Amino acid sequence: MNTYCLPPEITPEIFLRDYWQKKPLLIRNGLPEIIDELDASEIMNLAQSEDVTARLIKQHSEDNWELFTSPFDLDDFENLPDRWSILIQNLEQWSPSLGSLWNKFGFIPQWQRDDIMVSMAPDGGSVGKHYDEYDVFLVQAYGHRRWQLVDSA
């Protein structure tokens, strides 16, 4: 039995051979246990902690973005534009239950893992177009998101 987050037909060996660092893999409902682990108020509270690394991105227009870094206070979340995103890094340090997600990826060498990040945004909120220079597992807990992938080759 596959105890990882992979579909039954994809073993860790198949994932590493055919997908890891080669092509994206969408797994719908891959981690149902994380639903409701963090709600919006908990994310906002974490972002206000001095020890947390967080970013707030405000989109004022199609090509006008503004980046703010933590720590934040409650006033920072008032009068937000329609489109914004908040990101919190190293979530495994603040949520032991979410930190246990690494167990679902035990087949990935530990030296290739960085952190667990949470992103929250209203409808239409985004961090904008960007490239990640490292491997990323994106876990969308709820809501709808439009993901676009570009072949970097």
Q: What spans do the regions from the language model cover?
A:
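Active-site region of the double-stranded beta-helix
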Residues: 1-18, 31-153
